Design a protein with these regions (language model features):
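Positively charged n-region of N-terminal signal peptides that target proteins for export
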Residues: 1-4
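N-terminal signal peptide c-region/cleavage motif recognized by signal peptidases
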Residues: 14-16
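Beta-strand-enriched cores of mature, soluble protein domains
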Residues: 20-153
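Sec-dependent N-terminal signal peptides
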Residues: 7-8
């Protein structure tokens, strides 16, 4: 159960890649685990997963890439005796094919989705700072996930 929930969290970060009222920035992505650490404590479990992702945009506006790579790190906490996480967060960093940088932060939601926003960027990404997205894992399997994301503003 913890792996499924963590995979769900992992699939949500790229949702922040585009927003600011731009419904065209919906898309999907894949995340492959590159590192995973778990800390067991008396009160619960803390997990950290780093993934190498590819984000593919359905209909990017002119000047934006159709796809880009990202490195994401996700954290979650599950209290002892619980099946669902009590919380989680994630951060992604990406450099697009043109060399522009973007950073995203997200928080796990109670419905299993991940709410993300663009926190900063350079070049074309500066116009999207503050844009919000929602992501949901479509498939999770053996250290990888496939997810969908769409803007919420």
């Amino acid at each position: 159960m913890k792996n499924i929930i963590l995979s769900a969290v992992l699939g949500f970060l790229p949702a922040t890649a585009f927003a600011g009222g731009h419904a065209d920035f919906a898309g999907h992505g894949t995340g492959i685990y590159s590192d995973r650490k778990t800390i067991e404590a008396t009160a619960g479990t803390h997990s950290m997963v780093t993934t190498n992702d590819v984000w593919i945009y359905d209909n990017p506006p002119e000047g934006f890439p159709a796809a880009q790579k990202a490195i994401c790190t996700y954290f979650q906490v599950i209290a002892t005796g619980q099946q669902q996480p009590s919380g989680g967060s994630g951060t992604c960093q990406a450099v697009d094919p043109d060399g522009d940088i973007s950073l995203w932060n997200g928080v796990a939601q109670s419905d299993g989705t991940l709410a993300f926003s663009v926190t900063t960027g350079t070049g074309k990404w500066t116009a999207l700072i503050g844009a919000k997205f929602l992501g949901k894992t479509r498939h999770s399997f053996g250290g990888a996930s496939v997810y969908d994301f769409s803007p919420v503003n």
